[in-house]
């Protein structure tokens, strides 16, 4: 198990026990927390109009679920949106917005949180022998080509 909650224990490998329970509350960015997350207003197949990295305005239609519009909860950069054509239940998290429009570049990079968790996944793969460690900086089957 890998801890995914931000804070001192982020990405800690837990060999016994469980990670902290999901609070359902995203981290606060520029004073916005839960307002950044958009949940499906209805069940059905989603048809996206907007894409990741689009600058969106509050109440702008981002997608449709059947004949129900999915609107932006605030103005900012669309940091994530569920894949077009996916069937969603009502209430499912389907998108999130970063209120910092100047941070559009973050849509194309790996976050600190993702990088930390990926490092822990690699640690587990190596320690369990799933991914053999051959020499410093080199892994089995990976070439520079």
Predicted regions and their residues:
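Well-ordered secondary-structure scaffolds
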Residues: 1-145
């Amino acid at each position: 198990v890998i801890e995914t909650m931000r804070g001192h224990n982020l990405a800690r490998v837990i060999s016994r026990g469980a990670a902290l329970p999901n609070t359902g509350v995203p981290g606060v960015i520029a004073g916005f927390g839960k307002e950044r997350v958009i949940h499906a207003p209805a069940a059905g197949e989603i048809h996206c109009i907007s894409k990741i990295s689009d600058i969106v305005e509050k109440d702008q239609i981002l997608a449709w679920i059947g004949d129900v519009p999915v609107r932006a909860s605030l103005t900012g950069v669309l940091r994530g949106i569920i894949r077009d054509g996916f069937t969603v239940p009502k209430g499912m998290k389907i998108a999130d917005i970063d209120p910092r429009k100047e941070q559009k570049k973050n849509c194309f990079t790996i976050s600190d949180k993702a990088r930390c968790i990926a490092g822990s996944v690699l640690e587990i793969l190596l320690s369990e022998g799933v991914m053999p460690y051959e020499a410093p900086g080199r892994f089995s089957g990976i070439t520079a080509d």
